[in-house]
Amino acid sequence: MGSPFLNHRLRSELGDLALLHLRRDQTIPTILKLEDDENQGYKEGKVTNTRFGSFPHSTLIDQPWGSQIVASVVDTGSRGRKNQSSKKRKADDLDTPTSNKDEAQSSPGTPRAAASGFLHLLYPTPELWTASLPHRTQVVYTPDYSYILHRLCVRPGSTIIEAGAGSGSFTHASVRAVFNGYPSEAPAAKKRRLGKVCSFEFHAQRAQRIREEIHDHGLDALVEVTHRDVYEDGFLLGDPKTGKSPKANAIFLDLPAPWLALKHLVRRPPSGAESPLDPSSPVYICTFSPCIEQVQRTITTLREYSWLSISMVEVNHHRIDVKRERTGLDCEGVRGATVFPKSVDEAVAKMRAVEEHSRRFRESLLQESDDEGTASDKPAATKSGKTEVEEKSLQDISQHSDTTAAPSSTPSYDLGRLVHRTEPDLKTHTSYLVFAILPREWTEEDEQRCRQAWPAQKTGGSPDAGKPKGKKQLKREAKEKEVQEEAQKSEDVPARPQETQS
């Protein structure tokens, strides 16, 4: 089947890499399994716990990708018995067969749906993997690597060198861009160039970790991870001195000092070793630097090694949130609304209403005290804990609020002012991208071969000399010939002498 990043099935299966999408900025990667390898002791088998509930993997298997999965109620009481298998067994239990017990433990229980909580089951893509991968180093996010791959002219069948694999975000994106088939051991009828990613990493543990991820994701045949110091040893595959050239068309350097590695990215290395670049095509390069001083040194070195079309770009990616904003005293209880006077007139009307209600409340208290004859007696409280005067005043306030709010035929989703704001949390970082192009090397042999394939035309000859003439052109030439003949005849006729008058 190949890698799930390149071609996936319609439904999830046992052993697949799945991404559990909880919300826009939270995704959990997991391998779908029935049995719990970590022995957490759940009766339902392998369970993934999130802030939105528990999800046994038995509910995630054989589901269409993109499905909404409801959380389940798991048997947490069985977790206390998870270490029973490691304890010593009694002598009476040694003679009893354990196959039935093992089968009972290996078969997960049937989960029950919980009252709330859900997630979405998604198949892996480079964009989702970037949002959910474990961060080992600085991550190249989707807005950056999409623009980088576009400027590097990466296409199916290209070979790209990546120096500084890090967390593997750019690796997964680039392998999808260059993929045009898997290499096969059988000789093909028509040989074609397959896309490949040659990734180099200086840190040994990170190189081993990215190598394991590439193997788990089924990308071994398309990505070759090498642990090497590219500053000193270059970019050849295998042995640094006598290795094989990757014949790269594109280069991405995510290094602290990319200018130190440019001495190996030339057409003819001074050491006499084979060049890692493709001799039959121009090579595109991009360096990823967080400081402007690094950019200056990189550009200076690129000019020394004959790189052309040098430019620097800074990618600033912002998501714009568009929504309706409701403000006013009549928006109390509306989700996301601002209960505040939207104008001076509304604020003044509210103050006058409050003053009027206070005046009515005081007058009612005085009137009630005069009727009873004792102003110090407290009015009787009702079931709600308030006096009759307070309840009457509250009713007047609610009635006044209802009358001030003018009825509207506009639906609730269309009320308010349409506004847009930039997202508060930007998942990006400051980075400067330097792009350059190294043209193809052109020799005298190449010039002679092209001259033989496309010979130059003779000097003074017409480019349409060998083409047949059309009817219009023949008529035009015949007419021009007649005009020339008439002009020549008029020149040959001598002038007649003038007759004298007698």
Curated annotation (Swiss-Prot):
Keyword Methyltransferase attached: yes
PROSITE patterns: SAM_TRM61
Localization per record: Nucleus
Reactions accelerated catalytically: adenosine(58) in tRNA + S-adenosyl-L-methionine = N(1)-methyladenosine(58) in tRNA + S-adenosyl-L-homocysteine + H(+)
Gene Ontology biological-process annotations: tRNA methylation
Any one GO cellular component localisation term in the record: nucleus
Biased composition (Basic and acidic residues): 385-394, 475-494
Region (Disordered): 76-112, 365-417, 444-502
Biased composition (Basic residues): 79-89
Residues annotated for S-adenosyl-L-methionine binding in this entry: S167, G168, S169, E201, R206, D229, V230, D254
Alphabetized GO MF terms: tRNA (adenine(58)-N1)-methyltransferase activity
Pfam families recorded: GCD14
EC number: 2.1.1.220
Function: Catalytic subunit of tRNA (adenine-N(1)-)-methyltransferase, which catalyzes the formation of N(1)-methyladenine at position 58 (m1A58) in initiator methionyl-tRNA.
Family label: Belongs to the class I-like SAM-binding methyltransferase superfamily. TRM61 family.
Protein name: tRNA (adenine(58)-N(1))-methyltransferase catalytic subunit trm61
Species: Aspergillus fumigatus (strain ATCC MYA-4609 / CBS 101355 / FGSC A1100 / Af293)
Gene expressing this chain: trm61
